[in-house]
UniProtKB/Swiss-Prot annotation:
Family matches, as Pfam families: PapC_C, Usher
Listed GO MF terms: fimbrial usher porin activity
A biological process from GO: pilus assembly
Name of the gene this protein is made from: ydeT
GO terms under cellular component: cell outer membrane
Matching PANTHER family: FIMBRIAL USHER DOMAIN-CONTAINING PROTEIN YDET-RELATED (PTHR30451:SF21), OUTER MEMBRANE USHER PROTEIN (PTHR30451)
InterPro entries: Fimb_usher, FimD_plug_dom, PapC-like_C, PapC-like_C_sf
Name recorded for this polypeptide: Fimbrial usher domain-containing protein YdeT
Residues passing through the membrane, by range: none
Length: 382
């Protein structure tokens, strides 16, 4: 039994009947054989071969596909040569295709320590021939830009000529940006006399107890990063994601029921911000929004030498300031490293329980240039 699926008319009297599908139950699938072989050739690349045959009832004809190829690297330059053959019972002609591709990274011509914006870009070329006179050539460049590699671009042009194919030129260009507050994309394509422009935006929003946070498109399970005061800090191993102006960020995908490591990049912290810890581990359940909280100390960073009387404050003394009760421990020669200090204030120093084992430091930080990461000063404890 055979027949067609007919598209219903819309009411236009000039519309012709459209046959959108064909079926033939007389030629039902009977059996299939497949073989696939691949082999690494050490530093010389790899080769592969695959073949398949689909047989049908009530006919001796069958669908046949054969392909084999060779991939050969020349350092960081990659090349491939492939051949494919196909024949099916619905077509009288057999299809052949011979294809060659070449990919050259821009870094091939750069030093290993190059900071060029195009160090992650590539040039590509491909040629295919149907062995009937038809040939297609494509060439282009693609890669990533920006320090976080979150701007992907691709430009390609090509032409087709000869054989039974229609001759002409074609091309396209695309830009895809992945940002902390969402993704955007724009593209242009042209083929023959027709052209197309497209663009789009996507993202996600989480409403939580501390407000609203924007991010990239959300998955089923995700992580909300909370680091108040640590704004515009990069999230390690996440493309284009950093904390917003309040110190919040969304990690749109997380592994459920497993430890997820969330790390802030300490190198992207502002000069007056220090984190108690830069790595937090969360274990979300399915569909949950896990929160990774980081405690940021905002203020001056000081390496202070404390004097008590004519001597240094004893080794092991605890120094606290304001509401920070965690304290810092005094090292040798009365030196202590303090973070999150306001421009002026008081420090409480303690190394025992009696009144002679406690003192207070009145300090005032000097005005320093923005590039100064650490103040050093000596203070008297009274």
């Amino acid at each position: 039994m055979s027949g067609y699926t007919v598209k219903p008319p819309t009411g236009d009297s000039n519309e012709q009947t459209q046959f959108i599908d064909y079926f033939n139950l007389f030629y039902s699938k009977r059996g299939q054989e497949q073989i696939s072989i691949s082999q690494q050739l050490g530093n010389y690349g790899a080769t592969f071969f695959s073949a398949s045959r689909q047989s049908y009832w009530n006919t001796s004809r069958s669908d046949q596909q054969i392909s084999f190829g060779l991939n050969v690297p020349f350092g960081d330059i990659t090349t491939s040569l492939n051949y494919s053959y196909s024949n099916n019972i619905w077509q009288n002609d057999r299809d052949h295709l011979l294809a060659f591709t070449l990919n050259v990274p821009f870094s091939h011509w750069m030093r290993t320590d190059s900071q060029s914006a195009f160090r992650n870009s590539n040039a590509s070329y491909s040629m295919s021939n149907d062995l009937k006179g038809g040939m297609t050539n494509l060439s282009g460049v693609y890669g990533t830009l920006l320090p976080d590699n979150n701007l992907n671009y691709s430009v390609q042009v090509g032409n087709t000529h000869g054989g039974n194919t229609s001759s002409g030129t074609s091309g396209y260009s695309t830009l895809n940006y992945r940002g902390a507050y969402g993704n955007t994309n724009v593209g242009y394509s042209r083929s023959g006399d027709s052209s197309q422009i497209y663009y789009g935006m996507s993202g996600g929003i989480i409403a939580h107890a501390d407000g609203i946070t924007f991010g990239q498109p959300l998955g089923d399970t995700m992580v909300l990063v909370k680091a108040p005061g640590a704004d515009n800090v990069k999230i390690e191993n996440q493309t284009g994601i950093h904390t917003d102006w309040r110190g919040y960020a969304i990690l749109p995908f997380a592994t459920e029921y497993r430890e997820n490591r969330v790390a802030l990049n300490a190198n992207s912290l502002a000069d007056n911000v220090e984190l108690d810890e830069t790595v937090v581990t969360v274990i979300p359940t399915h569909g949950a929004i896990a929160r990774a909280t980081f405690n940021a100390q905002i203020g001056g960073k000081v390496l202070m030498t404390l004097k008590y009387g004519n001597k240094s404050v004893p080794f092991g003394a605890i120094v606290t300031h304001g509401e920070n009760k965690n304290g810092s421990i005094v090292a040798e020669n009365g030196q202590v490293y303090l973070t999150g200090l306001p421009q002026s204030g008081k420090l409480q120093v303690s190394w025992g329980n009696d009144k002679n084992s406690n003192c207070i430091v009145d300090y005032k930080l000097p005005e320093v240039s923005p590039g100064t990461l650490l103040n050093q000063q000596t203070a008297i404890c009274r």
